[in-house]
A protein has these predicted regions:
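Glycine-rich flexible loops
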Residues: 1-253
């Protein structure tokens, strides 16, 4: 099953594609500002509207901080570059195409190496504890991959990742980084942002050597936190775009 996208007329599809390009370019730029990317090695993608299963992704060799909306390439689920300049990184293909193919929620797939979630992935038994209000929302959405030691070099490994992710939206990949999926770019970005902040709080608390003060589990399903509304996710990315409009306006070109 491929990710669910809407079918639009050609003109509407062009407008929708450009809007997605600008949102994704903003996510690349903000990710660079926050230090989430690993030199030129990380990758983010989004399915395009239309009948054909095509996705936008960054081409190999670009820093996140330099990417513009027009730089993103269009690929199919077989890894062929259909539009744009550059090549598709093989690791990116095996992760993104397989998740897009199998997970209907995964219209957007973000794969990065943010400091605190990545550090958590390196700890034996490292998981986000129910120790901050953010976790009341996040904990039921996270899966931890403790088997993936090898680099992602084939579809078999991509399929394993997609199966393990299942209907969750966040995967902390053991000794690696994090993959977050969402129905829209802004939802995936917002969830990634919250997860990384939550990991930062926990890693900071753990560095004291003191015992974490956890929240009783009975509160988990009674409170979703202020980030349960996708409107806030849209407003969050829009706020960053206003900053970029002032300081890095070329992102949307």
């Amino acid at each position: 099953m491929t990710a669910v996208v809407k079918t639009l007329s050609d003109s509407k599809a062009d407008e929708a594609e450009w809007a997605l390009r600008c949102d994704m370019a903003a996510i690349f730029r903000v990710s660079a500002r926050l230090g989430w990317n690993e030199q030129i090695g990380n990758h983010n993608s989004v399915m395009l509207p239309g009948d054909e299963p095509l996705f936008l992704i960054n081409a190999r060799g670009y820093l996140f901080r330099e990417l513009r909306a027009s730089d993103l390439i269009v690929c199919d689920l077989d890894g062929r570059v259909l539009r744009g300049k550059g090549e598709l990184r093989k690791v990116a293909f095996h992760i993104h195409a397989r998740i897009h193919l199998t997970n209907p929620k995964a219209v957007t797939v973000l794969h990065v190496h943010p400091q605190h979630l990545t550090a958590l992935s390196m700890i034996d038994g490292g998981e986000l504890a129910l120790a901050h209000h953010n976790n009341l929302l996040l904990n039921d959405r996270i899966v931890y991959d403790t088997a993936g030691y090898e680099p992602v070099h084939d579809n078999e490994e991509g399929d394993r990742i997609a199966r393990l992710l299942g209907d969750r939206t966040i995967m902390v990949m053991g000794n690696h980084g994090v993959t977050v999926v969402g129905a829209t770019p802004h939802e995936a970005f917002d969830e990634l942002y919250i997860a990384e902040r939550t990991a930062m709080y926990q890693m900071t608390a753990m560095s004291t050597g003191m015992k974490l003060r956890t929240i009783p589990d009975r509160f988990r399903r009674n409170y979703l936190g202020p980030w349960g509304d996708t409107v806030d996710a849209r407003m969050h990315l829009d706020a960053w775009r206003r900053v970029l409009d002032r300081e890095e306006p070329d992102y949307a070109t």
